[in-house]
């Protein structure tokens, strides 16, 4: 799909090219107050009051998400006009904008339009410029057009015909909007990779498959990939990671992916992604109902790989290292048992009270490994706890950090990227719940504050660098009729790196 940018100040009579240019449809926003302004006012004038008459007749009330097509409109070059309800003008915020653009894309994709002129990006949204609106609109469109068909014997072809979108933006935002197009396409491509990896079944997306995916990203985008096997992991003394992997016939992999966009001496940001490609719970076996969704337990790894692809496509001037410990968590005669004690790469001993709290066991060794890069910051991403889903639901990812400045950067990025996160507590008092009579610490801290104690466990392995943890158990995938991976938190991570790179 092709996206282009055209500057236009509708209030200054600069709309002639839009009014006369050939297009299958021009998209206009209407507030509930039904007062026309900007593009809608110019189009109304050019069509001799058609939009005003439609509103007066009651066919478009401006309620959020409502759409109405006007066909064979005279006075303009577009063969159709799509009116999109924006809701109340004084309540028009990021969510209202996203609702409006999503409604517009759904309406357009149900038709046979090929080329569209899109004016909604110029709407005032929380004092954001139109380049932000362009990026959000492209991501919304790519979200609507994403389909996972790789495992179908006869994949259905795309039903829409849309091929080209021309965005009208404020002239002062034209240059930034062109950058936004590039970033949005790269982000969408990274999110699609993340979704594809999550949606693949566990018998396809194995640890070896993730390792090969990292190698392909490296080959396609000029990165450096290292994929360590069992013997190399053993040599590193990653006893905690290996305690999870030991009962599976699938060999574990430890993936390290390097992107160098800045000077070699510049400290990298390290992203660590949990890569449990299927989680049965091990000896602490999960209930059978819904266990199929445990193929999504590698979505932390998928989001890190998707972010690396997006960063490479954007060409960010920053150094980034991705680390992915990946294995299956299976029961078996040689599986780790509740009560077993294992030794981490750091040397700390861990009493494994529950083998279904395995994500932290593979992440802790990866976080120790990250020290060798002398990182500027480390962010781990994991579908870590059901407790985080109970606390935050499916809207916000849980953010934990021992560094207030880093947490602030991530929260700012989450708002800019429309990929919400909520900071959770990480007080020292919670550490007491991880005490063990027999080892340095236990891998669980009981039912109270389960998401917090999981993050507290990880914090024991992050004392030498600024660190944050994103628990995406509630946001990485959806269940029900819309079942599938979401691609989150690729937008948040990518925006954080864009901000760090100053781009």
Curated annotation (Swiss-Prot):
NCBIfam families: PRK00913.1-2, PRK00913.1-4, PRK00913.2-4, PRK00913.3-5
Gene3D superfamilies: Leucine Aminopeptidase, subunit E, domain 1, Zn peptidases
GO biological process: proteolysis
GO molecular-function term, one example from the UniProt record: metalloaminopeptidase activity
List of catalytic residues: 286, 360
Name of this chain's protein: Probable cytosol aminopeptidase
Claim: Acyltransferase is one of the keywords in the record: no
Localization of this protein: Cytoplasm
Keyword set, alphabetical order: Aminopeptidase, Cytoplasm, Hydrolase, Manganese, Metal-binding, Protease
Family: Belongs to the peptidase M17 family.
InterPro entries for the chain: Leucine_aapep/pepB, Macro_dom-like, Peptidase_M17_C, Peptidase_M17_leu_NH2_pept, Peptidase_M17_N
Main location: cytoplasm
Cofactor(s) this protein requires: Mn(2+)
Function: Presumably involved in the processing and regular turnover of intracellular proteins. Catalyzes the removal of unsubstituted N-terminal amino acids from various peptides.
Enzyme class: hydrolase
Taxonomy of the source species: Bacteria, Pseudomonadati, Pseudomonadota, Betaproteobacteria, Burkholderiales
Keyword Cytoplasm: yes
Cofactor note (record): Binds 2 manganese ions per subunit.
Reaction equation(s) it catalyzes: Release of an N-terminal amino acid, Xaa-|-Yaa-, in which Xaa is preferably Leu, but may be other amino acids including Pro although not Arg or Lys, and Yaa may be Pro. Amino acid amides and methyl esters are also readily hydrolyzed, but rates on arylamides are exceedingly low; Release of an N-terminal amino acid, preferentially leucine, but not glutamic or aspartic acids
